[in-house]
Amino acid sequence: MDTNLNFSPSQSNDLSTSSGYENVLSHFKQAALSVTQLYQASTTEVLKAQKAGYNQALREVLELIESGASIDFISQYCLEKLASSDNDSSVHNHHDNSVLRNEDTQLQPHIVCNRTVRAGRPVLDEDDEEMNIATPHKRRVYDLNSSWMKRGRR
């Protein structure tokens, strides 16, 4: 009976192994291509988002300059934005790796900068006396909520 079939079990294993290997290899290549395309698409989107954010920041600073804001105020505004951005990106709950929002932690970034550049010149020691004015100077400022308000100068 075995002589009539001319089919051995070893030939069957070789065929299924080679076709299985080719099938796995084909699926692996498809998965690798999908991952590569996903990476390229996400990189493109990240670059677009960074460029849009940079352009938005330039528009905000330009708006402040056009509104007549002082160099001190623009510097303070930029520092507050940077501090807010740093807090948003680095505040994590280490137990479950979830991001906490500023509202959750009630962080209000406020940076006091004692050494700034005024009118394009470095701050000198005698300028420290100007910082201790009894009556604060009122000025309009652009707060982090994108609105104008009056605030006393420190």
UniProtKB/Swiss-Prot annotation:
- This one is known as Uncharacterized protein C6B12.14c
Which superkingdom heads the taxonomic lineage of this protein's source? Eukaryota
Q: Which GO terms describe its cellular component?
A: nucleus
